Amino acid sequence: MGGGGEDEYESLPTHSIPVHLAAGALAGAVEHCVMFPFDSVKTRMQSLCPCETKCPTPVHSLMSIVKREGWLRPLRGVNAVAAGSMPAHALYFTVYEKMKSFLTGNTAGHEHTLAYGASGVVATLIHDAVMNPAEVVKQRMQMAYSPYGSSLECARCVYNREGFAAFYRSYTTQLAMNVPFQAIHFMGYEFWQQVLNPEHKYDPKSHLIAGGLAGGLAAAVTTPMDCVKTVLNTQQAAEADPSNRRIFLKARYRYRGISDAVRTIYSQRGMAGFSCGLQARVIFQVPATALSWSVYELFKFMLSFEGGHSS
């Protein structure tokens, strides 16, 4: 029985779309929600209107937010990202598995590294189209002095004041960041899987380690574009006044694209501005991607085993 389960787990990429959808949706929710407080810290550090208190580390920043604003504040926007990440990751993992199977002939090995990267790029195009609106709402909820009572109110206000285009203003930047991120991420994961788990059986330890290493490297390399994306998503806060939150809502955006945001970041912070939030981003991504791959592979294994057992 155990051998049959492993065999079906190995053959999953060729035929089991429902399993990939279910496992991917759950993995997405875990990835984005478990380490969400550090994502909130990263957003504030990268915004051009960070909180007044300068903190030496992301952990100190998180403690400062909790002390000044309450322990629930770092979780603002988590429901938006959960709602967006489940369908986005369901499609993301499914497209990746199908593209990988198509490009490699369902075989594994270091010679397929570019195929893994290409599969990740295609999956990212689909993922970001679904995820970008949730990302906009999430980051505006994360900002200090954010006036929105809920993610739904935030989405409604953004739509009424700025139109539907506001939800995709950072889409090209998101792709410019996530295409290399996911290419590095997937190539790194498959590389470490080949090193740690050459038989490609279900092995929780190898999935955890490979996911964490791949996610950490990809996060560090793509931090500059993440800074640009955050500025585009949160630019309303550029004119926020703690004593009058209505100014936040009435502020008009100033950066119409990547080039405007890049120039503004450089003029205000220099080259160091493109590495803001690097530590917080890596702290978020290493456990997040490790857990995401672990949950995905676990549920893929469990669902395939259940299917084999019932038949």
Curated annotation (Swiss-Prot):
A GO term, aspect molecular function: ferrous iron transmembrane transporter activity
Tell me what topology the record assigns in the membrane.
Answer: Multi-pass membrane protein
Q: Which domain of life is it from?
A: Eukaryota
Q: Which PROSITE patterns match?
A: SOLCAR
Q: Name one GO cellular component term.
A: mitochondrial inner membrane
Output the InterPro entries linked to this UniProt entry.
Answer: Mitochondrial_sb/sol_carrier, Mt_carrier_dom_sf
Does the keyword Translocase belong to this entry? no
Stretches that traverse the bilayer: 17-36, 77-96, 112-132, 170-189, 204-223, 277-296
Sequence ranges of the Solcar repeats: 15-102, 111-195, 202-302
Which biological process, per GO, is one annotated for this protein?
A: iron import into the mitochondrion
| SUPFAM superfamilies, alphabetized | Mitochondrial carrier (SSF103506)
Q: Print the keywords alphabetically.
A: Ion transport, Iron, Iron transport, Membrane, Mitochondrion, Mitochondrion inner membrane, Repeat, Transmembrane, Transmembrane helix, Transport
Localization annotation:
Mitochondrion inner membrane
Q: What is its main location?
A: mitochondrion
Alphabetical list of Pfam families matching this protein: Mito_carr
Family membership noted in the UniProt record: Belongs to the mitochondrial carrier (TC 2.A.29) family.
Q: What is known about what this protein does?
A: Mitochondrial iron transporter that mediates iron uptake. Probably required for heme synthesis of hemoproteins and Fe-S cluster assembly.
Protein name (record): Mitoferrin
